[in-house]
């Protein structure tokens, strides 16, 4: 399972695109109509087809094909509505759509949908420690992306999203050597932006708190 920031690094998409529909966010009545086709398949077959669609979805992401990735995650959901990875993968795609949105309103919609899908994925999160940790990394990254988006238009909203990202990260810090983790940039970038916000707002105590949490190299850029 790739984390969101790994996938964002891989995916540089042409700016002009029409996002594929995410069926997981359709109204309940429409979802029930779509899911009716599941009754044509035996249980074991449905699970295998769902797992295969997840694999194809991430293969499409590797090829920077967001629309086909979304279609595959939709297919995984149709065969198994409790497949956590269908929601998770769709959430990643929505985050990447936001990175390539044509305007602010479109980007905001994609970001909000990404967060909704992460919330849906949490309902079906397994007990596997590694899966849980990777999910938390991606979930924190989604709040970080939202915070960055709102930095120019609504700094209070940006602060809220950055604090959500930090809150997800804090439990992970107990078991992590941050200097050795490739995903530590999510945490450090979050703290860097909070440091700048609190400095600009004149909140000295909070400014010092987050400044002291940063590596020396990042402090120089403030």
Q: Which residue ranges define each predicted feature?
A:
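Short coil turns that delineate tetratricopeptide repeat
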Residues: 81, 126-130, 170, 219
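Alpha-helical segment of the N-proximal tetratricopeptide repeat
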Residues: 46-71, 75-78
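Short coil/turn linking the two alpha-helices of tandem helical-hairpin repeats
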Residues: 58, 96-105, 140, 145-154, ...
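Conserved structural position within tetratricopeptide repeats
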Residues: 77-78, 116-123, 167, 174, ...
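Canonical tetratricopeptide repeat
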Residues: 89-90, 138, 145, 186, ...
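TPR alpha-solenoid repeat register
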Residues: 86, 131, 135, 183-184, ...
């Amino acid at each position: 399972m790739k984390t969101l920031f790994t996938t964002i690094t891989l995916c540089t998409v042409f700016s002009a695109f029409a996002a594929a529909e995410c069926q997981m966010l359709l109204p309940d009545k429409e979802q029930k109509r779509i899911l009716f086709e599941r009754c044509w398949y035996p249980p074991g077959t449905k699970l295998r087809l769902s797992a295969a669609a997840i694999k194809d979805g991430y293969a499409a992401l590797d090829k920077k094909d967001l629309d086909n990735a979304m279609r595959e995650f939709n297919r995984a959901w149709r065969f198994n509505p409790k497949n956590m990875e269908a929601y998770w993968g769709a959430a990643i795609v929505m985050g990447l759509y936001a990175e390539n949105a044509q305007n602010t309103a479109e980007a905001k919609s994609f970001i909000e949908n990404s967060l909704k899908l992460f919330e849906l994925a949490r309902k079906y999160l397994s007990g596997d420690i590694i899966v849980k940790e990777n999910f938390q990394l991606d979930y924190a990254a989604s709040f970080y992306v939202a915070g960055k988006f709102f930095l120019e238009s609504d700094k209070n909203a940006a602060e809220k999203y950055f604090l959500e990202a930090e809150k997800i990260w804090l439990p992970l810090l107990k078991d992590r050597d941050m200097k050795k983790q490739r995903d530590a940039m999510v945490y450090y970038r979050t703290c860097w932006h909070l440091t700048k916000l609190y400095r600009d707002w004149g909140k000295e105590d909070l400014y010092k708190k987050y400044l002291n949490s940063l590596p020396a190299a990042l402090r120089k850029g403030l």
